Amino acid sequence: MKLRIATIAGLVVLGSGFAVAQTDVIAQRKAILKQMGEATKPIAAMLKGEAKFDQAVVQKSLAAIADDSKKLPALFPADSKTGGDTAALPKIWEDKAKFDDLFAKLAAAATAAQGTIKDEASLKANIGGVLGNCKSCHDDFRAKKS
């Protein structure tokens, strides 16, 4: 009887650890996605004419986007489809290769943009590849906000 209770207690503890780990990965990816969103804000302000072009800020933002894009695919394991507050659509796991490829393309676009953006004109001419990759992922793999 004591062995049975100990076994059940152990399974409950293991199960709760799984739930916490699952929630942790969701929290991690949400934090990185928020960080990426924050990195785009100064660029968007420059594009709208709300802020003066600042190459150092653009470079820092693009570096953050490239770096974060490389981390994100690992933060969408199959066991994180449910169990937390997430806007991730099931399509992510149905077409994980395409999803992961979009992050690779985003990282490549951000890295390439770092090499080509030197002023306001080149920002406007070259940022589309970065922002387009963001949009593709949001359109296909993120639940729409209501």
From Swiss-Prot:
Give residues annotated as binding heme c. Answer: 29, 86-87, 134, 137-138
Which keywords does UniProt give here? Electron transport, Heme, Iron, Metal-binding, Signal, Transport
One annotated GO biological process: electron transport chain
> Which residue positions does the secretion signal occupy?
1-21
Q: Does the UniProt entry include the keyword Signal? A: yes
Can you supply one Gene Ontology CC term for this chain's record? periplasmic space
Report if keyword Transmembrane helix is assigned. no
Q: According to its UniProt record, how is this protein modified after translation?
A: Binds 1 heme c group covalently per subunit.
Instruction: List the disulfide bonds in this chain.
Output: none
Q: Name one GO molecular function term.
A: iron ion binding
The protein's role, per its UniProt record: Cytochrome c' is the most widely occurring bacterial c-type cytochrome. Cytochromes c' are high-spin proteins and the heme has no sixth ligand. Their exact function is not known.
* Complexes and interactors: Monomer.
Protein name listed in UniProt: Cytochrome c'
